[in-house]
Amino acid sequence: LSSAASDVYKRQLHNLGFTKGNILEPSMGIGNFFSGLPADMSASKLYGVELDPVTGRMAQLIYPDAHIEVKGYEKTDFQNDFFDVAIGNVPFGQYKVLDKAYDKHNFYIHDYFFAKTIDKVRPGGVIAFITSKGTLDKANPSVRRYIAQRTQLLGAIRLPNDAFKNAGTSVTSDIIFLKKRDMYIDTDEDWIHLDTDENGIEMNSYFINNPHMVLGKMEMVSGPHGMESACVPESGTSLADRLRQAVQMIRGEISIDDTEISDEELEDESIPAEAGIKTVSYTHLTLPTIRL
């Protein structure tokens, strides 16, 4: 999760009226989102999941007050309807994980993260995920329909394919904001389907109807499997500025019960920091031996 995207998340959560609650980041890395939470969100309880053992242990050291599980998301057992907010950059790939609660849907990893997180968030709570454009642009609408039946699309922002170049990736990505419905509904909203723009490029209907939420220019480019659509950056524009403008266009309000933040007893998997090390700071350390 890049720092720019983290700032967008925080800004939009503030715009939606979120102050404090239970926050989940299910693929957290070292936890960029947790760093520098605004003062009005600092009372939130933080929960994270990270598969990589070294990265996960680092996150536990940096955020000793957070509940961070170092394991696959499919191996976690958070209760349903528990989190007020879920954020993160979901893994993407043409592979699947075993989770008996979702195996019947045959989800790929990125779709699985959406489905499981929807169940873990309270009705009225918000999910904000970065995902490959495949989530919104894939030809088969079944996963989008699954999501739409359970959540309301508040908005989406399409990022140019160089947005995460510092992480060594060149892929068109979307930031998607969803609000969990109170109940399952049968719906056929526009964003479930694809359409074509004036240049004949196929993409999600949401972006056809909201071209200002595409922070670049959609073009056909050469990909690993032939020609494919991509959002290419436009010269002379600041992505950070365009992100700030785009997020202001997303409307909605988080609506959750004003209950106390959970203090449920969870197994403490954190690593004690050495004396004198401040929270949300870095230090040199010797990591424990990790047997794979």
What residues fall within each predicted segment?
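Conserved proline-anchored active-site loop of SAM-dependent methyltransferases
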Residues: 10-16, 22-37, 71-101, 111, ...
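Single conserved hydrophobic/aromatic residue that forms the stacking wall/gate
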Residues: 1-5, 9, 284, 289-292
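Charged, often flexible domain-edge or linker segments that flank or initiate folded functional domains
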Residues: 31, 253-285, 291-292
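Flexible, glycine-/basic-rich loop-and-beta segments that form/coincide
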Residues: 165-259
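Class I S-adenosyl-L-methionine
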Residues: 3-62
